[in-house]
């Protein structure tokens, strides 16, 4: 096989969404698996809707996911002369023609078709204009579109690696436009010219583009160019099998990033939207998918987006991430919540991250779980107050805990646990009667990391202060 060359061609008219990210990833994995090239092309011929901000977001999203490109970004808006050159070639060879029909004429054709129960199609009115007629229209200042002469009989077959052969009757196509009256190419025409000039061997894209493919094949054939191989991946649907949209929660890469998902978890999850490794494992790193990825293993069936599964995968990565890397990516979330400023103790944060990460699913969760290390506990979980602070002996137990902790030296998780175990025996109570109200007193919460980990990280002074504050709270509550 000649060198594999694939492309991802986003339009900079919005965010990089999960479907687009998956298309980019599948192209990238296919290129890396085959030792080929991944090209980034920007379909920005819609100048009114394309924005620099969108393009910047798409590039940042790809980089964040670890999807690097070998060539590009190549902007269609900078290649307009190339499209005009190929359109002129088709005009010269009689495979395309100028069409001067007005909006009113086209509307009349649509109405007539509707009246006759036919699908609305261009009638080919300008297909056989004479050279003199064309020159006269141009002299009058009329601005034509250019239409492709589509064969009116036969079939166009899409040989799709994922879906098999898909046939289209040529009679269902009219002579579609390849160049607009403002001299801009249509999507299908620009795509064909680009794919040819960039040497694209495989076009891997979403199923929604399948209807464009026969038109692109007709353009390839008219230009006498080699047709690339096609692979159309299934749609990503919402859990109710409707089209995925904002009402189903986060759908853009930036939103996932802001909500504290790790790029490795996103890549792992979106790889599973249509592909699975040979061993059926659901947690795998990108080196494994690069090694195993083939289009033959991509499913034809729609992929169902499941945010709970994504969050579960993200939790796995948080628990197993390199601790320094995890600390670095948590820090911006701590800053955003004003838990820390620019001057912070990295080693202290790292220690806290190491104890809180076991239970958390996102970086936002990790940051929230760290709150009581940086801010005072101003309120206690209501269910904890009812369950632990209303017990008759709790004040006496906590007072004895303060006396005990004041004597502990050095103050760490081992010495505090030893002291607490002895106190439990001395008071002849269950460990829960001491441990649970202490946890609530020093963290404001009923669940979290190990109690003695929390004590060590808070330090002796803050631990005792918080227990004393809780005693005061309980006594006031009882008055």
Curated annotation (Swiss-Prot):
Source species, domain of life: Bacteria
Short sequence motif 'HIGH' region: positions: 10-20
Keywords, comma-separated and alphabetical: Aminoacyl-tRNA synthetase, ATP-binding, Cytoplasm, Ligase, Nucleotide-binding, Protein biosynthesis
Keyword ATP-binding (UniProt): yes
UniProt-listed Enzyme Commission number(s): 6.1.1.17
Reaction catalysis annotation: tRNA(Glu) + L-glutamate + ATP = L-glutamyl-tRNA(Glu) + AMP + diphosphate
InterPro entries with a match to the protein in the record: aa-tRNA-synth_I_cd-bd, aa-tRNA-synth_I_codon-bd_sub2, aa-tRNA-synth_I_CS, aa_tRNA-synth_I_cd-bd_sf, Glu-tRNA-ligase_bac/mito, Glu-tRNA-synth_I_codon-bd_sub1, Glu/Gln-tRNA-synth, Glu/Gln-tRNA-synth_Ib_cat-dom
One function term, GO molecular function aspect: zinc ion binding
Motif 'KMSKS' region: chain residues: 243-247
Biological process terms in GO annotation: glutamyl-tRNA aminoacylation
GO CC terms in record: cytosol
Localization per Swiss-Prot or TrEMBL: Cytoplasm
Residues noted as binding ATP in the record, renumbered to the chain: 246
Enzyme type, top EC level: ligase
UniProt record similarity statement: Belongs to the class-I aminoacyl-tRNA synthetase family. Glutamate--tRNA ligase type 1 subfamily.
Subunit structure: Monomer.
PANTHER family: GLUTAMATE--TRNA LIGASE, GLUTAMATE--TRNA LIGASE, MITOCHONDRIAL-RELATED
Summary of the function given for this chain in its UniProt record: Catalyzes the attachment of glutamate to tRNA(Glu) in a two-step reaction: glutamate is first activated by ATP to form Glu-AMP and then transferred to the acceptor end of tRNA(Glu).
Full protein name: Glutamate--tRNA ligase 2
Name of the coding gene: gltX2
């Amino acid at each position: 096989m000649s060198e594999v060359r694939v492309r991802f061609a986003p339009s900079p008219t919005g965010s990089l969404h999960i479907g687009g990210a998956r298309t980019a990833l599948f192209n990238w994995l296919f290129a890396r698996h085959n030792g080929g090239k991944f090209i980034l092309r920007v379909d920005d011929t819609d100048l009114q809707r394309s924005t620099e901000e969108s393009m910047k977001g798409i590039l940042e999203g790809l980089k964040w996911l670890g999807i690097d490109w070998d060539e590009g970004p190549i902007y269609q808006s900078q290649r307009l002369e190339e499209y005009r050159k190929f359109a002129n070639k088709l005009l010269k060879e009689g495979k395309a023609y100028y069409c001067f029909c007005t909006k009113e004429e086209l509307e009349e054709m649509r109405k007539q078709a509707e009246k006759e129960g036919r699908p609305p199609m261009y009638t080919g009115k300008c297909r056989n204009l004479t050279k003199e007629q064309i020159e006269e229209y141009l002299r009058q200042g009329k601005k034509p579109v250019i239409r492709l002469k589509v064969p009116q009989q036969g079939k166009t077959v899409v040989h799709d690696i994922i879906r098999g052969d898909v046939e289209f009757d040529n009679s269902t196509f009219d002579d579609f436009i390849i160049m607009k009256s403002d001299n801009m190419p249509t999507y299908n025409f620009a795509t064909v010219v680009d794919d040819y000039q960039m040497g694209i061997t495989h076009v891997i894209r979403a199923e929604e583009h399948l209807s464009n493919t026969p038109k692109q094949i007709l353009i390839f054939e008219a230009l006498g160019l080699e047709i690339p191989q096609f692979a159309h991946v299934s749609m990503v649907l919402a859990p109710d099998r409707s089209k995925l949209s904002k009402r189903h929660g986060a759908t853009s890469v930036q939103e996932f990033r802001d909500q504290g998902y790790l790029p490795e978890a996103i890549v792992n999850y979106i790889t599973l939207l249509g592909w699975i490794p040979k061993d059926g494992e659901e947690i795998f790193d990108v080196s494994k998918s690069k090694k195993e990825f083939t289009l033959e293993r991509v499913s034809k069936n729609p992929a169902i987006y499941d945010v709970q599964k994504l969050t579960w995968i993200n939790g796995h990565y948080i628990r197993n991430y390199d601790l320094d890397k995890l600390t670095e990516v948590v820090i911006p979330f701590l800053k955003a919540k004003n838990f820390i400023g620019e001057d912070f103790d990295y080693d202290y944060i790292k220690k806290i991250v190491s104890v809180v990460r076991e239970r958390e699913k996102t970086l936002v969760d990790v940051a929230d779980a760290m709150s009581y290390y940086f801010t005072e506990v101003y309120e206690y979980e209501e269910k904890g107050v009812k369950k632990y602070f209303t017990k008759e002996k709790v004040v006496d137990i906590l007072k004895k805990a303060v006396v005990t902790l004041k004597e502990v030296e050095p103050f760490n998780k081992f010495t505090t646990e030893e002291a607490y175990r002895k106190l439990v025996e001395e008071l002849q109570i269950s460990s829960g009667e001491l441990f649970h109200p202490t946890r609530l007193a020093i963290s404001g919460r009923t669940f979290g990391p190990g109690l003695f980990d929390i004590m060590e990280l808070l330090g002796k002074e803050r631990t005792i202060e918080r227990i004393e504050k809780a005693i005061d709270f309980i006594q006031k509550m009882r008055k």
